[in-house]
Amino acid sequence: MLTSLALPLALLLTQQQSIADRLAGRVPPDIAALATELATDAAGRGLPIDPIIQKAIEGSAKRVPAERVGAAMRLVVTQLDAAAGGLRDGNAALSADTVAIAAGAFALTAGLSGRDIATLARSGSPPAEVIVGLRVAGTLVALGVPASETMTLVTGTLQAGRPAGELLALPGRVQAEVAKGVTPAQAAAGLARAAAAQARRGPPPGRGQPPPHPTPPPHP
């Protein structure tokens, strides 16, 4: 019994030391202590810890007052919790993926909602593409595309079965259209119409359908 209790404690101490090592010399001691506490608790709940550590380092590098850095780290934890909840509502398997949670938190920070996260999670796309979709959605909102147009564009692209590379190209394509004089919303709407047309035509070759049977050899 004592051994079974000692193992989690040993892992906890090792994790805390690892976090402390990453922060050593980069943040003040009080920020390091709070970051270690928040990150250790987050890890115990299956949340990623890198966003918390990065926020501590970023704030300290900018000489932000300690109380503001602490508030920012707590907000990161809140966003990670909300992202995990949204993923859980849409696809329970994704809620255990720390990369997906971090991507969801990024999208929430940009201005999407927990419901939006759930919608993307249940799109039916492979997990890796959902993660890309979350990051692209957050980037689009940060570029000024309204959340509703962002969701229409990203979900439409996912449902059309387009590859991850095309998802990653969406922010650049929106910026290119904006440079021609349209608004971010108009640019996204135009791209969404193209994605919807692709969805009606079906997935591109090699996606969403079984490979063709090989031609049988001729009879001797």
Question: What feature does the model see in each segment?
Answer:
Residues 2-13:
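Sec-dependent N-terminal signal peptides
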Residues 14-220:
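General marker for long, soluble alpha-helical cores
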